[in-house]
Design a protein with these regions (language model features):
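Helix-adjacent hinge/juxtasegments
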Residues: 67-103, 115
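Short, surface-exposed acidic-centric catalytic microdomains
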Residues: 30, 34-59, 63-67
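N-terminal Rossmann-like dinucleotide-binding module
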Residues: 1-43
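Conserved small/polar residues in nucleotide/adenosyl-binding loops
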Residues: 153-160
Length: 162
């Protein structure tokens, strides 16, 4: 069974969907064993606690450099024997050391159908608002493997909604 860490920055609605799916037995090959928040006090940590999952905070601003932040994050993941990382509304960009430590084992959940409505500022409800403002008839979400290029060449799934 894979030990899964979910990285979050806010309310944790994607985290809750993953926890609910796990509770229904839909993920027999993995278990969420750690939630890492980018700041204290986010509701996602409360969701983790309610589900009996350990929650920790690793804040970028607590480290002098991005490399130091990445080292702290990597140490947190390794010390919890994490096999798979899911970015579920995590608003920090991971550095090369983290990505290299988890090749094709970091998944990002993006709230739009990539390549539309992605890039700076496109997180949370913003991609959906942009899609509505543009008059899109179909919207949805994308799950993709994270790579150093911040590209979307390794898409795992598109899920559309009307």
């Amino acid at each position: 069974m894979l030990n899964v860490a979910v990285l979050v920055s806010g309310g944790g609605t994607n985290l809750q969907a993953l926890l609910d799916s796990e509770a229904r037995g839909e993920n027999p090959n993995g278990k969420i064993t750690l939630v890492v928040a980018s700041k204290p006090g986010v509701y996602a940590l409360e969701r983790a606690a309610k589900a009996g999952v350990e929650g920790v905070v690793v804040r970028r601003k607590d480290y002098a450099t991005s490399e130091a932040f990445d080292a702290a994050l990597l140490e947190t993941l390794k010390s919890h024997n994490i096999d798979l990382v899911v970015l579920a509304g995590f608003l920090s960009v991971l550095g090369p050391s983290v990505i290299e430590a988890y090749p094709r084992r970091i998944l990002n959940v993006h709230p739009a159908l990539i390549p539309s409505f992605c890039g700076p500022g496109m997180y949370g409800l913003r991609p959906h608002q942009a899609a509505l403002a543009r008059g899109c008839k179909v919207t949805g979400a994308t799950v993709h493997f994270v790579n150093e290029a911040v590209s979307y060449t390794h898409l795992r799934a598109h899920e559309t909604t009307l």
